């Protein structure tokens, strides 16, 4: 179930938005009723979107996690709140804490952010699988180069996996601008 951070929490460190949370829970409950599994997938690429004038537009600002406008603590806050809301659903297969982070700050690398998030979630949910995407769009072909530091992450509950992505175009970018033919 992909979702956007700014839709579920319109103000960093604020409450979860009830209407969006209710939609998520309705979907999750339907999946549970059908004995299906759900992966909650924050689809923000390592960023928080600040809407221009409070609405979605081309003037939106995408703020990278780890700077003063969007701190690691802000990121941990939303996941701690989400985990508290969803921990009792049996159909939740895992929390994909961030889809395809890229261009993270050198001062706050993705592995630092991920470890803080792991710790925050485990304060409220010790059962659910944690899914950690690699750096630079979770690149499988460049994993050793860009995501090797993730091997040092520690889940105190030992229930964590890594997620790598492969795009089958000539440069593994996912743009498919050139054919293999």
Give the residues covered by each predicted segment:
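Catalytic domains of carbohydrate-active enzymes, especially glycoside hydrolases
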Residues: 1-4
């Amino acid at each position: 179930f992909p979702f956007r951070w700014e839709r579920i929490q319109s103000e960093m460190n604020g409450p979860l938005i009830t209407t969006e949370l209710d939609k998520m829970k309705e979907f999750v409950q339907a999946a549970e009723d059908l004995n299906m599994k759900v992966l909650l997938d924050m689809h923000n690429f390592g960023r928080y979107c600040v809407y221009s004038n409070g609405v979605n537009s081309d003037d939106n600002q995408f703020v990278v996690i780890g700077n003063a406008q969007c701190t690691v603590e802000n990121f941990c806050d939303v996941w701690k709140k989400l985990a508290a809301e969803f921990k009792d659903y049996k159909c939740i297969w895992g929390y994909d804490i961030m889809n395809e982070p890229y261009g993270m700050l050198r001062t706050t690398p993705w592995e630092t952010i991920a470890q803080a998030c792991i710790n925050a979630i485990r304060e409220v949910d010790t059962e659910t699988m944690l899914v950690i995407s690699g750096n630079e769009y979770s690149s499988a072909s460049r994993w050793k180069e860009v995501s090797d530091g993730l091997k040092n992450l520690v889940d105190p509950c030992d229930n964590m996996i890594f997620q790598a992505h492969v795009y089958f175009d000539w440069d593994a970018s996912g743009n498919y601008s050139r054919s293999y033919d």
